[in-house]
Amino acid sequence: MMSASESRLSTLFTHKALNATAVASLVGALVALTLYAFDSRELLGVSVWEKPLKFLLSALAYTATFSWLYSFVDRRKKFANLMGNLIALLLIVELMAIVGMASAGLTSHFNVSSPFHIGIWSLMATAISVVWGATFILGMSLWNSQLMSRDLRLAVRWALGIALAGMGIAFTMTPPQPQQIEPENWAGIAGAHTVGAADGGPGLPFFGWSTEAGDLRISHFFGLHSIQVLP
């Protein structure tokens, strides 16, 4: 027998796979936070657990939000459910890669230093590309939902558009920079997020966003998480 609070939650957050990924992300974030406090190892000048913690929190917000939005899907429900399942599964793949590499003291993003690292990076890039496509399709299922008020529907449309654009900014970070492919500068890295300077300079605490140059991660973050704010 469900309690009243459990019943309300099951009505609000209706996609089982997205709920499962949200719970897994929450548990993972709590573990990463604990390790962040007690594991002194560093990678690129910060705790090895900083990146996993950020991505786990982001995945928690993302999956919980889309589980809530799924409750407003009023057409092609089975197909929308399939897209939600795909998002949930591939985010788990992405998170496992990030957490696994960090726990070994290795970078995940932009790392092409060996066939193994290229494989991990390619897997991550493929997974998140499919997540983008599945999010777009799920968003189309919500576009004309009659289960929302007119104002909420308009807010969700704007939020989806901005979130998809924000997610898309990540793709602009992946091409190798000219200096990275010069033989004398080769360091096994292909891609960057800083504009006008090399990655790894001074940045904001925890977020790491550059304080000396442009940083594509800022627009990526605020674009992606507009879906939690606008509706």
Q: Which positions does each model-derived feature cover?
A:
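Helix-boundary and loop/linker segments of multi-pass membrane transporters
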Residues: S10-T11, S113, F206-T211
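Membrane-interfacial catalytic/cofactor-binding modules of polytopic membrane enzymes
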Residues: P175-S226
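Hydrophobic cores of alpha-helical transmembrane segments in multi-pass integral membrane proteins
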Residues: A17-A37, W49-F72, G84-S103, L123-L138, ...
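Membrane-interfacial loop-to-helix junctions in multi-pass inner-membrane proteins
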Residues: L12-H15, K77-A88, S149-V156
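Non-cytosolic membrane-interface motifs at loop->transmembrane helix junctions
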Residues: L43-P52, F110-L123, D151-L154, P183-E184, ...
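Hydrophobic, aromatic-enriched interface-forming segments
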Residues: V131-A190
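Short, Lys/Arg-rich, polar N-terminal cytosolic tail immediately upstream
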Residues: M1-T14
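Internal, conserved structured core segments that host functional sites
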Residues: H109-L147
